[in-house]
Amino acid sequence: MLAKLSRERWVVSNRDAEVRRGRSTRGGRSGGRAGRPAGSEADLHELRPAGEPGREPGGGRPVVAVTGAARGLGHALVSRLADGARIGRVIAIDDHRGDTTGVTWRVTDVRDPALAGRLAGVDVVVHTDLDLAPETDSRQRRTFNVRGAQTVLTAAAAGGVGRVVLVTSAMVYGARPDNPVPLAEDAPLGADQDGSVVGDLLEIEQLAQRSVRAQPGMAITVVRPAALVGEGIDTLITRHFEAPRLLTVKGSAARWQFCHIDDLVSALELAAAGEVTGAFAVGSDGWLEPEQLEELTGLKRIELPAGLTFATAQRLYRAGITPAPVNDLHFVVYPWVVDCEALRAAGWHPSYDNAAAVGVLLDQRAGHHAVAGRRLGRKDATITAAAGAGATVAVIGTAAIVRNARRRRRS
């Protein structure tokens, strides 16, 4: 799912390149799946701050504050902003001081209501301080993520900030076997509201919608990256590639789109400067077919019935064996490719294509072994691989083998 924008504690197919840039392979642009209430997405896509679009109040280069600036995505972003020409001044906010120079450090917890005082003189806030780690207790994680976003929005409004940039994920669109490929940026947010990381991000999206209506003088930008890869990125998606097999379900095929953290940082720079507004997606152009992914990774696929896969995954989650709800498994077996139209219109292009992103992911996985999203020691990983169990939920593969053997004996 999303990256661990952590608290440490956070090639396109050669076939039909025209279609892959902007049209669905299933008829419509984005489909019309029932999702959020009509009009809610339009609020985010159409909102602009008072005055000229893309310019913060007062004119000139904006003063930008970045939360979570001492680590992960936030650290990468403040480093880029400090070296760039788009931003006038960078305020780095975290619960401890980081090592980036050329910025002003303000040490505070993003959940502290006193944050408003730390935003004095700030034009734009980019909120990256999220805990999306697979092993974090779900209730603690949600409290941190949702309360943090809520405090940032409230403090920004109280402090007269002109724009807040929130980072969620393209996963909020949901992964479905009938998803258009690609999804349009204004497609309904169809992910399930549950106890997963995606549930946290949906709550943050809802906070953004409410802020749009309650604070018309403050613009909200929401950035939704595809599956993140890069240094320090640790998610259930990246762990899918640490397993001995790639899981697929019968009758459906995932298409794979990635977003390198460097590309996300460059997109956030544009958002901070007001050059891209509203809600938009970021990722590599196009997508990879299952056969391409298998060739690039050297991992074989294991195909299982959908009913068996999801029922077994649900039992494993309830038993505390796997770290994520069953709905998270949808994101490795169903498509959720997004069309990054807004960034293209702004002249932005990714530095990494999907094949290059997979190469980075494979380099990062060296020495790691995962089953059902849970990291294993070397001995356990060897046993798992020998058992032939596949992909994100290796135990599901074992269950399928046992069930098929029983059927053969009965016949």
Question: Which residues make up each language-model segment?
Answer:
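A hydrophobic C-terminal alpha-helical subdomain
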Residues: G307-H349, G377-T384
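NAD(P)H-binding glycine-rich loop region in Rossmannoid oxidoreductase-like domains
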Residues: R23, V107-R147, A155, G159
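Conserved Rossmann-fold NAD(P)-dependent oxidoreductase catalytic core, especially the SDR/UDP-sugar
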Residues: T151-S196
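N-terminal Rossmann NAD(P)H-binding glycine-rich loop of SDR-like oxidoreductase domains
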Residues: G58-D83
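Active-site Tyr-X1-5-Lys
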Residues: Q193-T221
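Mid/C-terminal beta-alpha module of Rossmann-like enzyme folds, strongest
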Residues: A267-V326, H368-L376, N404-S411
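Amphipathic terminal alpha-helices
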Residues: G39, L44-E46, D353-S411
